[in-house]
């Protein structure tokens, strides 16, 4: 499986979009059309890596640039300049945190019924709760424009620290029970570039200071570069060879990500009264495939890194179908 398969998914999304144009459902059309360029960029990244058009050493450095500079710039500029009036920010944060904790708790409670090793469980867990930022931000921007960037930043401010805490706790419990350190956990959260960008962006928004006019275009330009480069990196990181070896764990993780997490988000939206674009954005982010950075955490903290690579590749491919289906089937209920 390679770039050709991803291109077939692009064709599927495009054909579905044309068909649904005849039906007239504006939201379905908008979502599918937003996903087509995302899928094409991922396919291009996979093709560039497979054909060795660019040196393999480029991709890790590009991921580092995106994670520490470009994506934080996007969130910082988006939050600092966005009009958040009328957006139920606190309710949206509550929905995202509650749904994430619900699914995480469910997976831990039923861990023994999965009949997998402790390292394998940590990979299944990451696949169930982590999300691919680049796909989410691109889809949100395609659906809601500049407001989508602000909603994406709010989603990150809620999910990123929650997921980091949960994943570190799970690794500490199942892989390294003697190595857990609250100090290290707090350092990870405080120095996370995405969390820091959201914090300072919200600070400038709340205080009304804004970004100084001389440097605002700098952050805007850096942010605009984050999405295409990030999606190319997602494609370059795909490794389908590992997916064939662990079909059952891959399916368990995908079930948690594409079924349990969206359903938990729907329940949280209904319980807390979140509606409209904020509810759809919350549902969108909780139906995303897992993050490629999950592989790095699995390798560094004693998880099953090969299995994690298979989960990442499989979910990214499955998302071409499962992601829009999950969002569109449940969006009418929020």
Give a label for each model feature.
Residues 5-334:
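Alpha-helical transmembrane segments of multi-pass small-molecule/ion transporters
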């Amino acid at each position: 499986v390679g770039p050709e398969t991803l291109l077939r998914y692009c064709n599927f999304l495009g054909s579905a979009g044309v068909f649904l144009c005849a039906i007239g459902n504006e939201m379905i059309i908008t979502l599918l059309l937003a996903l087509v360029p995302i899928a094409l960029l991922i396919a291009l990244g996979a093709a560039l890596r497979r054909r060795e058009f660019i040196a393999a050493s480029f991709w890790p450095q590009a991921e580092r640039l995106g994670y520490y500079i470009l994506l934080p710039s996007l969130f910082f500029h988006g939050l600092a300049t966005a009009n958040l009036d009328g957006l139920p920010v606190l309710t949206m944060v509550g929905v995202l945190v509650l749904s994430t904790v619900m699914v995480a708790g469910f997976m831990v409670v039923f861990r023994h019924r999965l009949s997998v090793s402790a390292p394998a469980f940590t990979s299944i867990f990451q696949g169930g709760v982590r999300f691919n930022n680049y796909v989410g931000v691109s889809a949100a921007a395609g659906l809601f424009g500049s407001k989508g960037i602000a909603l994406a930043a709010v989603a990150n401010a809620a999910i990123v620290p929650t997921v980091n805490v949960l994943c570190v706790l799970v690794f500490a419990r199942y892989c390294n029970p003697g190595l857990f350190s609250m100090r290290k956990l707090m350092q990870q959260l405080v120095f996370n570039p995405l969390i820091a960008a959201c914090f300072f962006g919200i600070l400038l928004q709340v205080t009304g200071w804004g970004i100084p006019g001389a440097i605002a275009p700098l952050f805007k330009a850096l942010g605009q570069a984050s999405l295409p480069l990030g999606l190319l990196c997602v494609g370059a990181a795909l490794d389908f060879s590992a997916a064939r070896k662990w079909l059952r764990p891959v399916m368990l993780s995908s079930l948690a990500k594409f079924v349990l997490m969206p359903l938990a988000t729907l329940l949280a939206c209904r319980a807390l009264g979140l509606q409209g674009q904020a509810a759809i954005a919350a549902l969108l982010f909780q139906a995303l495939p897992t993050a490629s950075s999950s592989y790095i955490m699995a390798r560094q903290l004693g998880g099953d890194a090969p299995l994690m690579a298979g989960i990442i590749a499989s979910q990214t491919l499955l998302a071409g179908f499962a992601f829009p289906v999950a969002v569109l089937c449940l969006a009418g209920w929020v």
